Amino acid sequence: MEKSLNEVREAARKKIIYTQHALDAMNVEEEIVSYEEIRNVIFKGEIIEDYPEDKRGHSCLMFNYTLKQRPVHIVCSPKQEFLAVITMYVPTIDKWKDDFRTRR
């Protein structure tokens, strides 16, 4: 997944675009997530699932803790000219193990 991580970060250095779904998810009242927090996941986080056959093109699920120490997951897809952030969410214990990297 190291190659995929490099592709994600290289695409993000060019430009990051957000789908409407991602923007809506970032602005859920209980879990408002900033652009800076998303950038933190992209540039300091890790890929925990890889989806090479995704219908939108190769995509992956990334994870990191924000500076506020809350876990954040993003699904993104690296393109030639940009990184598309498809969605994001704050993972919960009912769906993820304590490490927030492993599904229940």
What kind of feature is each model-predicted range?
Residues 1-104:
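Ribonuclease/tRNase effector modules and their secretory precursors
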